UniProtKB/Swiss-Prot annotation:
InterPro entries: AAA+_ATPase (IPR003593), ABC_SmlMolc_Importer (IPR050093), ABC_transporter-like_ATP-bd (IPR003439), ABC_transporter-like_CS (IPR017871), Mo/tungstate-bd_C_term_dom (IPR008995), P-loop_NTPase (IPR027417), PotA-like (IPR005893), PotA_ATP-bd (IPR017879). Its EC number is 7.6.2.11. Keywords: ATP-binding, Cell inner membrane, Cell membrane, Membrane, Nucleotide-binding, Translocase, Transport. It holds the Pfam family ABC_tran. This is Spermidine/putrescine import ATP-binding protein PotA. The complex is composed of two ATP-binding proteins (PotA), two transmembrane proteins (PotB and PotC) and a solute-binding protein (PotD). The gene is potA. SMART domains: AAA (SM00382).
Length: 461
């Protein structure tokens, strides 16, 4: 990449977007280099499409600024920005044929007819639709319509091409074919692509750089290899591919304990006996008949053939491990597992308990999350004082019936930790409550939340 290409063509600085009281984007900062293929990846509702629409100009940022090629364009209307957008639903004009759909923007610019014809034919060639220029768009397949939409976008020679889940409506084979075509197209055009998707495999296949988002914030930015091999937190590790994510304790540098067993690793710089999250990819676990080489022994709980490998669940010391291997082991088989030090990834925990701001009502009552909770007797703190409240993840109890809870909320994120689930519940007070439970809940479940008095720790601010 030369010096010119290494410059940022898109600069998003401290951008937030509010819809009433809802925060769709929370102080997002992102630089996109000229000529890059950048994918913004995340689950539904994470803010990825909102960010794309702000860059395109279809919405306006509530805070912060956006620059393209060094020019501040936060308030600039879409048609005056050097970008074009390809939408999931194509947005083709049904009354125009393929040629006229692609030529539409050029005609608005009042370009000479010969110039328009030359540009349209070049765009059609680029997307492999040379013989389709006079076809009605309604007669085309989904993949062909998507090619026309892309041709219409690139014919204007934008500095940046924005793509909002453009392959989501296609079947699996067509999607994979179009992925490779998009990659080749990006290479040929040399312009900057910013691509939005929730499909992890798509992001890993297409991108120079992946931007992982959750809850309106950027979680991690990196190359596909970096994102996959070195996830920054448990959300990224869980969202990008399959992972075994377990609670562990860093004994000291290069030695970690999880699943009641000590393992050598390559990580260092953590405090002694520090709680950590341990990530092991299923393909990095070796499975074999029990022998002295086994670090763990367990029983195969399930085995499914996936075409190129078997995916097995193995129960070891009360913990479930997902294993991918070319060798097949029957359900019920006693097996050994081994993982090499460089395949164990250690992450600092984002938190070790729930922490809330609160107010001490009296020695046995504290207010937080908009509710008055009974707590164990508090001494040394005056009533009415602002306090910090700590609640262990396993001290939060979820109820099926919302009315049985002191407050209510919605399950937003579920992470399996080998022997329990770690849940993120967005309370109706608009604060996250983190819960460890053996009960099975679904994303989107409405729940009641209770906390027993002995599960609440009140600390003086």
């Amino acid at each position: 990449m030369n010096m010119q290409e290494s410059k940022s063509i898109i600069e998003v600085n401290g951008v937030s977007k509010f819809f009433g009281e809802k925060t769709a984007l929370d102080h997002v900062t992102l630089n996109v280099k000229k000529g890059e293929f950048v994918t913004i990846l995340g689950p539904s509702g994470c803010g990825k499409t909102t960010l794309l629409r702000l860059i395109a100009g279809f919405q306006t940022a509530s805070e912060g600024e956006i620059k393209i090629s060094g020019k501040e364009i936060t308030q600039t209307p879409p048609h005056k920005r050097p970008v074009n957008t390809v939408f999931q639903k194509y947005a083709l004009f049904p009354h125009l044929n393929v040629y006229d759909n692609i030529a539409f923007g050029l005609k608005l610019k009042k370009m000479p007819k010969q110039t328009i014809e030359k540009k349209v034919k070049a765009a059609l060639k680029m997307v492999g639709m040379t013989d389709y220029e006079y076809r009605d768009v309604d007669s085309l397949s989904g993949g062909q319509q998507q090619r026309v939409a892309i041709a219409r976008a690139i014919v204007n020679e934008p500095e940046v091409l924005l793509l909002d889940e453009p392959l989501a409506a296609l079947d699996l084979k067509m999607r994979k074919d179009m992925q490779m075509e998009l990659k080749e197209m990006h290479k040929s055009l040399g312009i900057t692509f910013v691509y939005v998707t929730h499909d992890q495999e798509e992001a890993l296949t297409l991108s120079d750089t992946i931007v992982v988002m959750s809850e309106g914030r950027i979680q991690q930015i990196g190359t596909p290899i970096d994102i996959y091999n070195e996830p920054i937190n448990s959300f990224v590790a869980d969202f990008i591919g399959e992972s075994n994510i377990l609670n562990g304790v860093m004994i000291h540098d290069k030695l970690v304990c999880f699943c009641n067993t000590e393992f050598e690793c390559v990580d260092e710089g953590f405090g002694e006996n520090m709680p950590v999250d341990v990530v092991i990819r299923p393909e990095d676990l070796y499975i074999f008949p029990v022998s002295e080489a086994a670090q763990l022994t367990g029983v195969v709980q399930s085995s499914v053939f996936k075409g190129v490998h078997y995916e097995m669940t193995v129960l070891c010391n009360g913990y479930e491990f997902l294993v991918q291997d070319y060798h097949h082991f029957e359900v019920g088989a006693l097996v050994g597992l081994l993982v090499k030090p460089f395949d164990i990834h250690i992450m600092k925990k984002e938190r070790v308990c729930n922490t809330f701001e609160g107010k001490l009502i009296d020695e046995t009552h504290v207010e937080f999350l908009g509710c008055n909770f009974e707590c164990a007797p508090v001494t040394g703190i005056e009533a009415g004082s602002e306090v910090k409240v700590e609640v262990g993840f396993d001290n939060v109890i979820l109820q099926d019936n919302e009315e049985d809870g002191a407050l209510t909320g919605e399950v937003k994120f579920i992470l399996y930790k080998g022997d329990h689930y770690h849940l993120t519940v967005l309370s109706d007070w608009d604060e996250n409550v983190f819960v460890d439970t053996n009960d099975v809940w679904d994303d989107g479940d409405r729940v009641g939340i209770t906390i027993p008095p002995d599960g609440i720790r009140v600390i003086k601010n």
